[in-house]
């Protein structure tokens, strides 16, 4: 059994509700484990970080946790460099259109405006674990640079006491200032509080395992750092009709399963025929492409689903309830169907837009809200690293004209003696 097919309607709560509630993981038990680690790094700095690096990453800690990128000259395959440079260019070009304008307006003779100012220091977490993610470095650093962040560092676990040149090259191409070789909750704590050797950051972004997420949530709750949306397992929801290629749909489901055993891969369709063909293609692919096979199979068996609804409208209703990290729309009228999307991290339209294009090269960001957080969070972007500062310049004439309203409002709130007076004396 690779992936199950369910013929459902929106009222089939016993089948759909557990899926909708997926990965809204209770972090309380993880927070209990993470809190003492974070506090220990806060109190003992580099010494604690060395102990946890050896314990959790199972490597001899590096002599220095910090690599200044300007001093590094990574040697990588020319093809990898070309791909990283191309990806960086596309990411940069797409994110440039997100840079907001400072605006102003005149209301009753008063000038009011918006000024966008960047966060000053940011850390971008690049996971270690089961894969290397130079693409995540590009996705995190480039929008921060465009926003005007002056101090950007990568935080990532060391591999055998050092880092692959591919990660260093990505950091250099993206424009980061330094790399901090520390992972997990201890790495997040180090860049949040700072240590003897590691500068602190005001804001931390990027995906990671549950310990990284718990550390970010804890430190954010303590007011130490700002964070992007809390990260959970990777996920894709595909809406497809009978115009979709079942082999391609199956490949897209499996590309998500390749991330990890807890990854979520769902197909919603109005075609039972497509559902059956996709199921066959998934099983066939698991046999033909055995690399990371156990991981993919467990992901598909535990978290993979094919839902056959009576019509596409119900597919979109379910998708908006699910609020997927990645949403693929492989339908005849995919451009029209885009208007039905309310909640999704990133949308991939048509048969030629697999998630992997956005993961690596097209230019959109792959640091996305998961576990239904797309209902309230957006993808990482330039605005993630900007603050909106409002300003006003009030005229004497406006003071005279608007004071009566200030008087009424301040008296109603019981604050006229000082609030009202501060306007009254300027008339």
Swiss-Prot record:
Taxonomic superkingdom: Bacteria
Signal peptide bounds: none
The keyword Transmembrane is assigned to this record: no
Matching Pfam families: Histidinol_dh
UniProt-annotated binding residues for NAD(+): 125, 186, 209
A GO CC annotation given for this chain: cytosol
Any one Gene Ontology BP term: L-histidine biosynthetic process
Binding site for substrate: 234, 256, 259, 326, 359, 413, 419
Reaction equation(s) it catalyzes: L-histidinol + 2 NAD(+) + H2O = L-histidine + 2 NADH + 3 H(+)
Coiled-coil spans in chain: none
Protein EC: 1.1.1.23
Top EC class of this enzyme: oxidoreductase
Positions contributing to Zn(2+) binding: 256, 259, 359, 419
Active site: 325-326
Pathway connected to this protein: Amino-acid biosynthesis; L-histidine biosynthesis; L-histidine from 5-phospho-alpha-D-ribose 1-diphosphate: step 9/9
Key words, A-Z: Amino-acid biosynthesis, Histidine biosynthesis, Metal-binding, NAD, Oxidoreductase, Zinc
Note on cofactor: Binds 1 zinc ion per subunit.
Stretches that traverse the bilayer: none
A GO molecular-function descriptor: zinc ion binding
Matches recorded under HAMAP family: HisD
Described function: Catalyzes the sequential NAD-dependent oxidations of L-histidinol to L-histidinaldehyde and then to L-histidine.
Name of the protein: Histidinol dehydrogenase
Species the sequence originates in: Leptospira interrogans serogroup Icterohaemorrhagiae serovar copenhageni (strain Fiocruz L1-130)
Gene that encodes it: hisD
